[in-house]
UniProtKB/Swiss-Prot annotation:
One of its GO terms (cellular component) is cytoplasm. The lineage of its organism: Bacteria, Bacillati, Bacillota, Bacilli, Bacillales. Belongs to the aspartate/ornithine carbamoyltransferase superfamily. OTCase family. GO terms for biological process: L-arginine biosynthetic process. GO terms for molecular function: fibronectin binding; ornithine carbamoyltransferase activity. This is Ornithine carbamoyltransferase. Its EC number is 2.1.3.3. It is found in: Cytoplasm. Keywords: Amino-acid biosynthesis, Arginine biosynthesis, Cytoplasm, Transferase. It comes from Staphylococcus epidermidis. Has vitronectin and fibronectin-binding activity.
Length: 30
């Protein structure tokens, strides 16, 4: 259970980072 929770947490962090980079790229295009 602990490993799965840690994995989900890391995945969420990765996703958030990708979201931020995507938004930054969008703002650069604008």
């Amino acid at each position: 259970m602990k490993n799965l929770r840690n994995r989900s947490f890391l995945t969420l962090l990765d996703f958030s980072r990708q979201e931020v980079e995507f938004l930054l790229t969008l703002s650069e295009d604008l």
